[in-house]
Amino acid sequence: MEFLGGLNEAQKAAFTTAADRWVKVIVGDLPDVSVNGRIIDDLLIRAEGTSIDGPGVILGQAGPGLLRPPGGPGEFLPATGIMSFDTDDLASMQTKGTLVDVITHEMGHVIGLITSPARKKGLVKGIGGDNPVFRGQQAQEEYRKLRDADELKPVPVENEGEPGTRDAHWREKVFANELMTGFVKQAPNPLSRLTVGGLQDLGYVVDLDAADDYSLPSLLALAEEGELRTHIAPIDVGIVLPTIPTVLPSDSLVTAA
């Protein structure tokens, strides 16, 4: 983590807690890359608080910045990322107790779930259609286990909401409070084996056993409780804008001496 400013100590601690959570499931190293003469080891995330538009509407912007070059180790996996949040929204999330889970969720997008790295690797199909899906082998296997089924099926990706929500998350109506669905709720928002399996499909070395306990929700129970609804953000929640990353040239990879 590299803090650029605009964050209080509690907010910095939330970013560190989120990074530590992902480090527990991603256990392998990525090849070093050289960026403007600086060696990047694994992933450099720059985080900041800044004034955007006051509470709600635009929470900020988060996602990969520079991707590793194609054809080599760590193909299309991020080398840098940015997490820039509106200071008013940071304060609001801190008060509501959702700050750590929101930052952990957005950090998942920086890492590549289900953003540009997944798309460049051909893992997301049906983008913009009625039924987008994630076709990574390990994620499909974890989805099979969750369904207690014999056959593999592609993992449903969000098919409702605005750009940045649809086609970029696990489907809310299927997975409810899983961390990488489109809306982070009050805790718990488990980081499941499905998400860790998606990381493995991206090319990360992972520890599936470090995932949180999670099971598919009872959709009937959710509907009866009034919790099953279309994927529209509450007006006071706001959105996080995606980034448009750049792929590094092949000579950015640092070879071992």
Spans of features found by a protein language model:
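Extracellular zinc-dependent metalloprotease catalytic-domain scaffold
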Residues: 1-104, 109-257
